[in-house]
Amino acid sequence: MNIGEKLKELRIQRNLTQEELADRCELSKGFISQVERDLASPSIATLTDMLECLGSSLKEFF
């Protein structure tokens, strides 16, 4: 499973829409969509922020 799929799975488990996650992380909905479809790769800092918004950590994610 790749990063985008794992992020999408976590987001769905938390009952969040892409827009809600984007608002919490101060990112665009389009960027969240691109990451989930593996069209964009988040930096480590952005990935860490996204995971914090999803109640997870890098250690748990990988």
Where are these regions (language model features)?
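Absolute protein N-terminus
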Residues: 1-3
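Conserved hydrophobic/aromatic packing and binding residues within compact polymer-binding modules
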Residues: 7, 21-22, 32-35, 61
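Short, Lys/Arg-enriched C-terminal cap helix and immediately downstream tail that follows
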Residues: 8, 44-45
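Short, conserved catalytic or interaction motifs in soluble domains
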Residues: 12, 37, 56
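Recognition helix of helix-turn-helix/homeodomain-like DNA-binding domains
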Residues: 28-42
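DNA major-groove recognition helix of helix-turn-helix/homeodomain DNA-binding modules
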Residues: 45-60
